[in-house]
A protein has these predicted regions:
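Conserved C-terminal structural/oligomerization subdomain of aldehyde/semialdehyde dehydrogenase
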Residues: 14, 53-54, 80, 96, ...
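ALDH superfamily catalytic-core signature
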Residues: 1-113, 176, 220
Length: 221
């Protein structure tokens, strides 16, 4: 949102989007950026991704590795090509690295729209499409316009907005001013097509328990 700490939001974006080259189930898929900070956020994120060093993750200094296989890399490129063909601009990356067929450059897309695959499908790669929004209500509607519902993140310094948006988002996990959300003490799980039940925390025990109901009568005899 416009009132977010942009530096913190950029740090969270890098963590939630590009870790493991975008291949975790809680990686951010779409970025919704309010009009007032859209250009600044896009430029800053694009500049930040340029600092990544691609390569073998076991080597010192490498900050982003390859995708799991060439098929996955080709799928990610197809997302980028679809977006560009429909009017998106590439602010950073956007191509296969010369390191090999499984390496995709960390990518930032601007001027994206709902008719692009990056809006409705899981990218599972290092691509951040930046969608514009005007109002809080529009942001919530856009965020919920998906069949998935595992994790989401948002940045705002308005306490009232934090509660309104947090409650309005249809996701099992909501990161508020945080890009890393998982730990063993927190319930992990989603809604809609992102599954049922929870792992972690005391709620994660529920799937391993059986409830016994005992109906008693005549205990005074």
């Amino acid at each position: 949102f416009d009132d977010a700490d942009i530096d913190a939001a950029i740090e969270g974006a890098l963590a939630s989007k590009y870790r493991n080259a975008g291949q975790t189930c809680v990686c951010a898929n779409r970025f919704l950026v309010q009009d007032g900070i859209y250009d600044e956020f896009a430029a800053t994120l694009a500049e930040a991704t340029a600092s990544f060093t691609l390569g073998d993750g076991a080597r010192e200094g490498v900050t982003m590795g390859p995708l799991i296989n060439e098929t996955a890399a080709n799928d990610v490129l197809a997302f980028i090509e679809d977006a560009v063909a429909k009017g998106a601009s590439v602010a950073a990356g956007g191509a296969r690295s010369d390191l090999g067929s499984c390496f995709i450059e960390p990518t930032v897309l601007t001027n994206v729209s709902k008719d692009m695959r990056v809006f409705s499908e899981e990218i599972f790669g290092p691509v951040a499409p930046l969608f514009r929004f005007g109002s809080e209500e529009e942001a919530i509607a856009m965020a919920n316009d998906t069949e998935f519902g595992l994790a989401c993140y948002f940045y705002s310094r308005d306490v009232g907005r934090v509660w309104r948006v947090g409650e309005g988002l249809e996701y099992g996990i909501v990161g508020i001013n945080e890009g890393i959300i998982s730990n063993e003490m927190a319930p992990f799980g989603g809604v809609k097509e992102s599954g049922q039940g929870r792992e972690g925390s005391k709620y994660g025990l529920d799937d391993y328990l059986e409830i016994k109901y005992m109906c008693m009568g005549g205990i005074d005899r």
